[in-house]
Amino acid sequence: MGSKTAENESQGGGNAPPSSTKATATGGEPRGAHWSRDGDGTLGEGEGDDDADGDNTSCAPAVPLNPQTAPSTNSKKRKKRPKKKTSALKQSSPPRIPLADLFPDHQYPHGEAQVYEPGLENVARTTADEVRHHSRHHIEDDTFLNDYRKAAEVHRQVRRWTQESVRPGQTLTEIAMGIEDGVRALLDNAGLDTGQGLISGLGFPTGLSLNNCVAHYTPNPGQREVVLDSSDVMKVDFGVHINGWIVDSAFTMSFDPTYDNLLAAVKDATNTGIKNAGVDVRISDVSAAIQEAMESYEVDINGRTFPVKAVRNITGHNIEQYRIHAGKSIPFVKNNDNTKMEEGEIFAIETFGTTGRGYLFDGPGVYGYGKDPSAPKRITSHLASAKSLYQKINENFGSLVFCRRYLERLGVESYLAGMNNLVSNGYVEVYQPLMDVRGSYSAQFEHTILLRESCKEVISRGDDY
């Protein structure tokens, strides 16, 4: 889930001209080079062989009876059928089998471990740095890591189903609810009872942003129903949390090869950002590498060639418990931010590329809401509906971002006046869709990484991206 920067906020070198199109770039590849390897961001067939399912079990030849010990009776002896191997439990489609049933030992797959770039000086820390580091010691805790890896595996299995099953003609509501129902089923937590949503669930509303809508669109009650078209480019952005620690990962789907290079540019830029991220790395260095990779691509649409531009006023971000945007931002363009990444931090490394202007504005409607983490536990308000709604938010979402669909799923009614009161008093922040110019197309790829002591773990990495 991208973090929008304040309007007109300076990002240092953000006004520098985009780098020219070229065959190679830092972390980049020539235009179109990815597609012989990466495909279009969707999962391939590669399921491997199915020998383990027991279907190919061979029968051992029967051993003849020893004539000396064979019984003298002529009665026929019933042959025992060979036992079939128990087939491994596989995820259903749509995904509904709790992950704990698929992993009975409750040990979940590790993310991709990347070594830090050589030459980084990771030992010279100030006292303040050491204090912050010790406050993040949980990142090496086995229970924390296993829970976080479980959330990542839930994300992988649900997005695999999404990539295999979502097709033009489906409504965005149908797609969003399929993703969200899958997440809840795999976590074995419907989230309907008070407090359940704080234990595990969706990290934020499922984003399904089409074409020039770059980010932060989710279908909500009262909106016009949108049907996915074969010409659409759809960003799919959803989060899975356990105990408030959110795995934030996103990908882009298209059904027309016209947009392959757009997807390739953004996927390359995201992987370049991951490669350059690390302990004690300056954010400005990561941003510069992202922009250089992204803007080395162009895309041909209807006979016109468009450079792929890095979006300038939305960023990657660090993640803290129950906070999807925790304060540090990673722009996708050159800047003068000398803030460093630190050991023990968690980052959502994401990039957005567009054929449009690369500057976003608020679109119509509402994506979701999020309680200000610094807001008080209880409020005083002359509006009873505002107080009861605020209590409902605290009990079910805390500071997690949520949407109207989630409120109505909990049975909350007549909440708009109370919500407007909470927003106007600064207790709750409202998020709107973010748009580029009409007629443009945009893409997004995103992973969550943990800056551990010995490596950076790309916890959401999968075979797909």
Swiss-Prot record:
Residues 31-40 have a biased composition (Basic and acidic residues). Its main location: cytoplasm. HAMAP family: MetAP_2_euk. Keywords: Aminopeptidase, Cytoplasm, Hydrolase, Metal-binding, Protease. Belongs to the peptidase M24A family. Methionine aminopeptidase eukaryotic type 2 subfamily. One of its GO terms (biological process) is proteolysis. GO terms for molecular function: initiator methionyl aminopeptidase activity; metal ion binding; metalloaminopeptidase activity. Its cofactor is Co(2+); Zn(2+); Mn(2+); Fe(2+). A divalent metal cation 2 binds at D248, H317, E350, E446. PANTHER family: METHIONINE AMINOPEPTIDASE 2, METHIONINE AMINOPEPTIDASE 2-2. Its EC number is 3.4.11.18. Substrate binds at H216, H325. This is Methionine aminopeptidase 2-1. It catalyses: Release of N-terminal amino acids, preferentially methionine, from peptides and arylamides. Residues 75-87 have a biased composition (Basic residues). Cotranslationally removes the N-terminal methionine from nascent proteins. The N-terminal methionine is often cleaved when the second residue in the primary sequence is small and uncharged (Met-Ala-, Cys, Gly, Pro, Ser, Thr, or Val). A divalent metal cation 1 binds at D237, D248, E446. Residues 1-100 are annotated as: Disordered. The keyword Iron-sulfur does not apply. GO terms for cellular component: cytoplasm.
